[in-house]
Design a protein with these regions (language model features):
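Active-site bordering "gate/hinge" segments
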Residues: 1-302, 317-318, 400, 427, ...
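Dual-mode signal for accessory low-complexity, basic/Gly-rich regions
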Residues: 262-461
Length: 461
């Protein structure tokens, strides 16, 4: 197999058109999986992806087109270079054409991919075995997995881009069931190297929540003050983040479209708290790729922006919308700043403090969630979402959990929820559940939302 660096050099040398950008990603992933409190599988996988993007001069301007492969062998280089050129010429003049970045170097270009492996689980594996033993003794069934990935990205071009980034990421997800599976709960822990993962803590949380479910309380659909753990908050705001393309707003096709003659809602107060929502490639513990590496163009990305820096973008400042996701092309059209979408998402409220337990203790009458799932969009104009609660909804009275209630289908807009935050806790790096496969670097606080709409009772368990 040709090294990523050599492959990029060969492809860009063979490209006899205006410019050529090659993006190579190498990924290794180690995993442990278990069911019924028994380890079922473990292993390591290795993957490579290669994207070749051609930039070709055509009548009226510049065209771009790309092809992606799981790998490119030496004898395939000429054909993949030609395929990219044909894709560009077939696409015609690119509406997002911009001047290409050149002669930028980032990272240790020449180093090999540092593969992850089973050793990353050395510290937690014995503790997992102990947890399985205890759970079997207490008739608790455990299901879940631990996985750790290491992704190396190289971006190179004819124009002198030589960019490299290494991204470690991991997570542990655990579902616990008891009493003939009539009780079920979940816990997830994000990590970069498993040094922060405490299996005894996960065990204690699962046992406590299963115990809470010993008392069942049936309640009707309605609006309830609802304590959302940081993971639930992240699943809601990630969807909002993905819906924040400036061009869509400018064209009146999103919740961020302007009113009363304004093209967008930038500058509008969206929250009743001084919310700061931002992406920052250097955020401690959530470090992410500091340059753009788009394999295709769309509302939020442009291959013409590849190689440009991603630093910090403030999406909300003091509760007001301050930016929407932009390419350079959309920034020109909307006459707004170039604010590329980031690879992490952080929400903070200055002065807010308190753990999830602290927020629960302050609720007189409400609900406590575990997770949200099956989240789908109902109305893009308001970003109304629907979904189900999962793995435990608890009744809170006078600051204490008094039992478990039935599940619900809910209907809410994360944009609207920003203005109905009763209490906000301390921001922490957290584990989304619904979107964890797509967005794995998030820091959010737990939040008490006022009058959260539990629209119908769900029979889901």
């Amino acid at each position: 197999m040709i090294s990523p660096q050599e492959l990029i050099e060969r492809i860009t040398s063979a490209a006899n058109y205006h410019d050529c950008i090659v993006i190579v990603r190498e990924k290794t992933q180690a995993n442990l999986r278990w069911a019924n409190s028994t380890l079922t599988t473990n292993g390591v996988i290795a993957e490579r992806s290669v994207t070749v993007i051609a930039f070709v001069e055509v009548e009226g301007g510049m065209a771009s087109g790309g092809v992606s492969r799981t790998d490119v062998a030496a004898h395939e280089i000429e054909s993949v270079v030609k395929e990219a050129e044909l894709a560009a010429r077939g696409a015609g003049q690119a509406p997002d054409a911009s001047e290409l970045a050149k002669n930028i170097s980032v990272g240790s270009w020449s180093e090999k991919h540092q593969a992850t492996g089973p050793d990353v689980f050395a510290r937690i594996a014995p503790a997992l075995g102990d947890m399985f033993t205890r759970s079997n003794a207490d008739s608790i069934e455990l299901f879940g997995y631990a996985e750790h990935s290491h992704i190396s990205t190289w971006v190179g071009s004819k124009g002198g881009l030589r960019l490299r980034w290494d991204q470690p990421v991991g997570r542990l997800e655990m579902t616990g069931k008891s009493h003939e599976r009539s009780r079920s709960t979940w816990e997830g822990v994000p990590t970069r190297d498993f040094s922060n993962v405490s299996i005894p803590d996960v065990d204690a949380i699962i046992r406590k929540r299963l115990q809470w479910q010993g008392k069942k309380i049936e309640i009707p659909a309605g609006r309830y003050d609802t304590v959302a753990p940081s993971g639930c908050v992240s699943d809601l705001l990630i969807y909002m983040f993905w819906s924040s393309a400036a061009r869509d707003a400018y064209e009146g096709q999103s919740v961020f479209a302007g009113k009363d003659g304004a093209k967008t809602r930038i500058g509008e107060k969206l929250s009743n708290h001084s919310v700061n929502l931002y992406s920052d490639a250097s955020y401690k513990g959530l470090e992410s790729i500091p340059f753009i590496s788009a394999t295709s163009s769309g509302p939020m990305s442009s291959v013409f922006d590849n190689g440009l820096a991603q630093t910090r973008t403030n999406w909300l400042t003091d509760g007001s919308l301050t930016a929407l996701a932009q390419t350079r092309a959309s920034a020109r059209d909307t006459e707004l700043s170039f604010t590329p979408i980031g690879d992490n998402l952080i929400m903070e409220v200055p002065g807010a403090s308190g753990s999830l337990e602290d927020l629960v203790s302050g609720v007189k009458d409400g609900l406590l969630l575990t997770t949200l799932w099956y989240i789908r969009q109902v109305d893009p104009a308001t970003l109304l979402l629907t979904g189900l609660t999962r793995d435990g909804v608890y009744r809170v009275k006078d600051g204490e959990v008094i039992g478990a209630v039935n599940n619900f289908r809910w209907n809410e807009s994360p944009v609207d929820l920003l203005s109905r935050m009763k209490t906000v806790g301390t921001t922490q790096i957290t584990q989304p559940r619904e979107w964890a496969d797509d967005m794995d670097r998030v820091a959010m606080p737990p939040v008490v939302f006022e009058n959260f709409n539990m629209s119908t009772v769900s029979k889901a368990n």
